[in-house]
UniProtKB/Swiss-Prot annotation:
This is Type II restriction enzyme ScrFI. One of its GO terms (molecular function) is type II site-specific deoxyribonuclease activity. GO terms for biological process: DNA restriction-modification system. It comes from Lactococcus lactis subsp. cremoris (Streptococcus cremoris). The gene is scrFIR. The ScrFI restriction system has two different methylases. It catalyses: Endonucleolytic cleavage of DNA to give specific double-stranded fragments with terminal 5'-phosphates. Coiled coil: none annotated. It is an enzyme of class 3 (hydrolase).
Length: 271
């Protein structure tokens, strides 16, 4: 066993095992509160550099939602930010144009006073058009792209929502660079860099809980390569779970897989 894994097992046994997280007073959604508590027990601070959390391993919290996140990875290009169509979105700032994008390609939430979001049903699955005229594809260069096609848009009021310049097919609305950034340093890292910086060092680990919510085991999984990951996107096992909504400048671009898949990657557990 490598010494880094041994050290993580030691930390788990001394700081985590047998404990039920005290998440009172934490102003974060439920799974996030548990995740932050666990990070603190392992001595992990806020990690903005997109590298593995600790000792070459990425920590993944056992989410009660039934799905676990690879990362919050926004697209490198959005239609409301980049030419030739960005001028069609009202607003003088990026966040205002993002709001306009949500109104054009998203849906209103009546429970939120009609606030529009690009999340849920407007977000396409891989290789399938949805009723909002959107489809996600993987291109030959391994970029992931969401296209909009007016002919596939089933909304009754699409002529009112979509400007004439966008009333045709296969319009790119979001693009993630797969393995190469054609603009070099501009518009961020590729998906390959983001994934492998976190998951292709020594691997990843998670901590599981027993029936009363106390942590009982630490489990490890092998490193994950971009080649494996993009194949999982292709098959629909990994999916894009957007949380973009009107009034919030953060795009919330989560890439996830169900917990059952993560569990299948576990190679060894320790109590």
């Amino acid at each position: 066993m490598n010494p880094n894994k041994e050290r993580l097992i030691e930390i788990f046994r001394s700081n985590v095992k047998g404990r039920i997280p005290d998440i009172s007073g934490r102003n974060i959604r439920h799974d996030g509160r548990w995740g932050h508590w666990l990070e603190e027990r392992f001595g992990i601070s806020a990690n903005a550099d997109n590298h593995a959390d600790i000792l070459g391993y990425e920590l993944k919290n056992e989410a009660t939602s039934g799905k676990t996140t690879f990362g919050d990875w926004s697209a490198n290009e959005y239609i409301f930010k980049t030419p030739p169509y960005n001028s069609l979105f009202s607003g003088s700032t990026a966040s205002e144009k993002q709001n306009a994008f949500c109104r054009m390609f998203g849906k209103p939430n009546e429970a939120k006073n009609g606030r529009f979001s690009w999340s849920g049903s407007p977000i396409p699955k891989i290789w399938q058009y949805n009723s909002f005229g959107q489809i996600m594809v993987i291109e030959e260069n391994l970029d992931i792209v969401i296209y909009y096609s007016f002919s596939q848009d089933l909304r009754y009021n699409k002529f009112e929502i979509i400007p004439p310049q966008l009333q045709h097919d296969e319009i790119q609305i979001a693009r993630w660079y797969g393995v190469a950034n054609p603009l070099l340093s501009r518009r961020g890292k590729t998906l390959k860099d983001k994934l492998e910086d976190k998951f292709n060092d020594l691997g990843w680990f998670t901590c599981t809980t027993d029936s009363i919510g106390a942590y009982d085991k630490i489990c490890f999984g092998r490193p994950i390569t971009f080649e494996n990951w993009i194949n999982l996107v292709d098959s629909g096992i990994v999916y894009f779970d957007s949380g973009m909504y009107e009034g919030n400048k953060r795009p919330y671009s989560q890439w996830r897989a169900d917990n059952s898949y993560w569990n299948s990657l576990i190679t060894d557990c320790h109590q």
